[in-house]
Amino acid sequence: MSGTSSIARSTMAYVLAGGRGSRLLELTDTRAKPAVYFGGKSRIIDFALSNAVNSGIRRIGVATQYKAHSLIRHMQRGWNFFRPERNEGFDILPASQRVSETQWYEGTADAVYQNLDIIAGYEPEYMIILAGDHIYKMDYEIMLHQHVERQADVTVGCIEVPREEATGFGVMQVDDTGRITAFLEKPSDPPGMPGQPDIALASMGIYVFKTKFLFDVLRRDAADPDSKHDFGGDIIPDLVENGTAIAHRFSDSCVRSSKTAEAYWRDVGTLDSYWQANLDLTNVVPTLDLYDSGWPIWTYNEISPPAKFVYDDVGRRGMAVDSLVAGGCIVSGASLSRSLISTGCRVHSFSQLHGTVVLPYADIARSARLRNTVVDRGVRIPEGLVVGEDPELDAKRFRRTEKGICLITQPMIDRLG
């Protein structure tokens, strides 16, 4: 955990958590993407919030919009430990037509602009704007120091990604000093990096500003009728052209599982990437280390008993290999391999799960076989259901991606009759 320096103490983190994340399909039918469960007991938003707290930042605002109830309830239960008497604060900021009776949040920049008065009440010297829907560990204090040292108007967090995956990101080009010379939001043909034509330098959706400067920029943007009021589409391209925009490499501030580990950052914006990021945690030495007490991922800890494995008969042995099983689960004569089972689930006798991510309070009946599957919260899998062995049948009954990952929700089960 980072030491609480004066720069962290004088910074406010502002988390943008209003997006749906439609590429996660039915997983976001009832909840915003930042509220989606991850890693057995956490939510996606816990990573950005934990990074802020671990970096020494004690003033946080979270802007919410799309189907925010689940997200707000989670934060009220798990993130209520800040002390106002120490100038700490945690504000949940739903879209509430604060500027206009007809205007909700119309873009990422507008989601900050509409709450300038609340931000001003904390009197932060610096602002760090964060996306609430990525999985990573990062020491924001290092990025803040770079911003101050370079005297930048804005510092943009960036990461190298395969060029073919960069169409969904802001893509930048930088000079030898790290100054951003061009910024394209979600280009159809992303430019490669010098000497690495197959790699693009993508924005992480993390921006550092001096607060007074940010206020001026947002007020000008709000008055521009041609703006879409978006950081990636409007604010950053303008500052690249007319100001000083500096790139901060994620590799410089990533909190790694070991000195030789890769810098782990995942967008988890699709069902395939979400499934893979969860199963990454089942590796013997995962690149993203949830067991690191020096940089913990804070969350709401439900009161639950330890996980329990029962029966040791031939063909009916409760066991798990290369798997994570959260508290409150009972694995009763079932076999799990390379799977992640969230809080409060039941897996009944003779069932077999491989490469399966099960969200909280699901119930897997006897003799089910699930392979390469995501099971939504509270789903009741019927006895003998087989998923992941017949692609054509899976596609008819459930949501199946081109890579063969199946999503199962309760309405899909109900339609089976």
Swiss-Prot record:
Similarity remark: Belongs to the bacterial/plant glucose-1-phosphate adenylyltransferase family.
Cystine pairings recorded for this chain: none
Transmembrane segments: none
Reactions it catalyzes: alpha-D-glucose 1-phosphate + ATP + H(+) = ADP-alpha-D-glucose + diphosphate
PANTHER family, alphabetized: GLUCOSE-1-PHOSPHATE ADENYLYLTRANSFERASE, GLUCOSE-1-PHOSPHATE ADENYLYLTRANSFERASE-RELATED
Functional summary from the UniProt entry: Involved in the biosynthesis of ADP-glucose, a building block required for the elongation reactions to produce glycogen. Catalyzes the reaction between ATP and alpha-D-glucose 1-phosphate (G1P) to produce pyrophosphate and ADP-Glc.
HAMAP family named among the record's database cross-references: GlgC (MF_00624)
GO biological process, one term: glycogen biosynthetic process
GO molecular function terms listed in the Swiss-Prot or TrEMBL record: ATP binding; glucose-1-phosphate adenylyltransferase activity
Gene3D superfamilies: Hexapeptide repeat proteins, Spore Coat Polysaccharide Biosynthesis Protein SpsA, Chain A
Organism: Granulibacter bethesdensis (strain ATCC BAA-1260 / CGDNIH1)
UniProtKB keywords: ATP-binding, Carbohydrate metabolism, Glycogen biosynthesis, Glycogen metabolism, Nucleotide-binding, Nucleotidyltransferase, Transferase
Quaternary assembly: Homotetramer.
Domain of life: Bacteria
InterPro entries: ADP-Glc_PPase, ADP_Glu_pyroP_CS, GlgC_bac, GlmU/GlgC-like_hexapep, NTP_transferase_dom, Nucleotide-diphossugar_trans, Trimer_LpxA-like_sf
KW Nuclease (keyword) present: no
Known pathway: Glycan biosynthesis; glycogen biosynthesis
Enzyme Commission number(s): 2.7.7.27
Pfam families registered for this protein in UniProt: Hexapep_GlmU, NTP_transferase
Protein name according to UniProt: Glucose-1-phosphate adenylyltransferase
